[in-house]
Amino acid sequence: MALASQLSVTDDSAYGFITTNAEIVSKKRKLAQNDDRFEVVMSVYSPKADSMDVGVSVLKLKTLELTLMSFCDSSTFVRTVNQIQVYEPTSIILPEAQSHSQIEKLKYIIHSNISDKVRERFMKAKVFNAFDGMNSLKLYTDINESTLGQVISNRKLSLAAANACIDYCVSTKMFRVTNKIRLKYCMCENTMLIDTCTVRDLELVDSLSETGTTLYSFLNCCLTKMGMRILRTSILQPSTHENSIILRSESLQELINDEDALISIRSSLKHTCDLEKVFSTFLEPRGLLSQEQEINNIILLKTVLQNTFVIRKSIQNVSSHLLVQVKQILEHENVQHLLAIINEYIRNDCQWANNSTELANQRANAVKSGVNGLLDVSRRIRETLLEEVSELVAKLSEELEIFMEYRFEISRGFFIKIKGNNTDINSLPEVLINRVKKRKTIECTTIELMKQSSRYNDIVSEITTLNSTIIHDMYTSINSYTPILLMVSEAIGTLDLLCSFAYFTSLQKDSYTCPEFAKEVTIMRSLHPILGGNNSNFVANNYSCNHELSRIHVITGANMSGKSVYLRQIAYLVIMAQMGCFVPAEYARMRIFNSLYSRISSDNVDINASSFSKEMSETAVILNDSDGDSLILIDELGRGSSLTDGFSICLAILEDLICKEATVITTTHFRDIAQVLANKSCVVTAHMQTVETNGQLEMKYNLVLGRNDIVGYGIRFAEVSNLLPQELIEDSKVVANILRSRKPVHGDKELKLLSRRRKLVLELYFALNYISKLNCDMNYKMQLLQTLQSKFVEEINITPNTE
């Protein structure tokens, strides 16, 4: 929630030969840079206690936006690391060495999860003080004390972190005492936690290969930098607030239904620059920018504000709540007031300068006539001087019968340029002094031109002084409107994101659907978002999860049968749904998950080189941090150990996850795991369908309930790969057959049948309960009940009663 209160091109000279020196050119070029990286300082604080409470503050020095957050983290500080990944700080402030193990562990984990480019700074513990933090916010924000106290009261950890953050920035002169901060408080409990390993495994924003496609690059149809930033944050931190997700979905549906409006909005967004970067220039203290840059920034701001009217016109007829909010922000009276202030002082025909000549002309002519009488007089004198110089050079050219042009540079004043390769520099008349040969031209001057240069510099200096006063007043006025400007930036970024989702959905060949939200998950004929769109033969799959009946899915199948792809597919669908995006499926009823953990290997045997110790350490994090609101995806659990140990560990981990009531989808080559857990009430066993034809395995890539009965697919895969000698393959087949014939049959058959019957009855109970709550026609309910009855009777009859 933003706490900031809502507040109340040039006339080119006819002579056109003015240039500036290299220093001015280099400063101007800084305006055209497209570098998003600027100083972001993050402060992290955890108290000397056994609790896992953490306070974080993030100060973006370019926009002077301070974000505060506090949350209860896990023992491995997963959420803290996630915030580092989201905000990408350039500096991290931490308490100095402490005797408390919890703080030392926090520092170690942060150090292990940041790049070498991120600076770690350690400050004394007394700087992390909540009382001083509150005083700092009172000093550096325009928010009244009562409002400030209501919003961030009882947020001691984030206040302590904020004090350290501000203290560091002031002491290092990154931040000036005259600056004012825009304050935000981030509610981390309304976002999904995706740990670092999951972000890596799923390739959400960075690809593991140079040519790989990430979810970010796949979904990114944004036209503005603001939209791209919001998209990245939405992927790394999907919302868990159902109403917010639904609001996005409603706006997205409206844009998809109104194609003309979508085209119009995207057309108006095409030429929108990085508003956050533009608006932040007015937060910089005066003196850091040249006057040319200041004028250019004001003209650029004017262009941006004029463009908001175009964007506003394109969304004039929207009706969904989120789009209406965007329109209201763009229609805010302060946007019009600010544009009126700029138009009062700046000429209407001024445009953003693209070269040094335009910058110099802006300095003299950008401010309107009539604003300052002395400035108007000085301008007329300047024009008269330019006319005199032009006449002087023309007369000299006629007398000497030499074609001449004049130029002006701040360091040299007026000078003459004579073109021609054959002109001898020594043969020129004596009136031409300070001669310099430059390639195909000769540059020189005269005594009279030097006098005119002196007069011109004096009058330009006077114009600069008068302009400086006017520009200073304008900067002061604009600075007071910064809160609404930053709101405009966020609103346009949100609009761009929604249009990006709508445009992306309209481009897809496969059907995308708006997900519903409930306690159960039902996804019909879903596709992998990235792979499905590029492959017309991609096989659609279903997924169903009922908390009591099917929250644990154990999937078996041959290598290269699509198990890993299926896990990624489910993860992408969940993330996209909680971003407010449509998903590739015929029907999708989703559950909102508070956290997502995945450990997914690759089906490429050349790069799949995981270690058992790494797998166990990552699995330990999942077991420690997951709960009933977590979605866990584990590929080939226990693959890095021996057969007996791997089987035992895999079974123990799944038993623990069953007790935690988390939603789990795991793949494994331990076929007996599926058999052991098959009669658990919450466990569903399935496999990726593989058909044997003429001794060859054909992958169907279709998820089918039940165990996989095909054996020996590992040997067959080795045989097809031609990596091993045929004699060795044949010996392997013989040994495998001998081992299978010796395998004892474990378990009591009667006990298994009893468990199976009890599970069928339990499934019937929950199915009846679900149908009773359906809001539908009674005839349809009767059809469902009849279908359920016939299916139950069929299943129960083939399962003998042992009681």
UniProtKB/Swiss-Prot annotation:
Keyword Lipid metabolism recorded: no
Record's signal peptide: none
Gene Ontology BP annotations: mismatch repair; reciprocal meiotic recombination
Matching InterPro entries: DNA_mismatch_repair_Msh2, DNA_mismatch_repair_MutS_C, DNA_mismatch_repair_MutS_clamp, DNA_mismatch_repair_MutS_core, DNA_mismatch_repair_MutS_sf, DNA_mmatch_repair_MutS_con_dom, MutS, MutS_con_dom_sf
Keyword tags: ATP-binding, DNA-binding, Meiosis, Nucleotide-binding
Keyword ATP-binding: yes
Residues holding ATP: 557-564
Gene Ontology MF: a single term: ATP binding
Gene Ontology cellular component annotations, sorted alphabetically: DNA repair complex; MutSgamma complex; nuclear chromosome
Cited SUPFAM superfamilies: DNA repair protein MutS, domain II, DNA repair protein MutS, domain III, P-loop containing nucleoside triphosphate hydrolases
Oligomeric and partner information: Heterooligomer of MSH4 and MSH5.
The protein's role, per its UniProt record: Involved in meiotic recombination. Facilitate crossovers between homologs during meiosis.
Record family assignment: Belongs to the DNA mismatch repair MutS family.
Protein name per the record: MutS protein homolog 4
Organism: Candida albicans
Gene from which this protein is expressed: MSH4
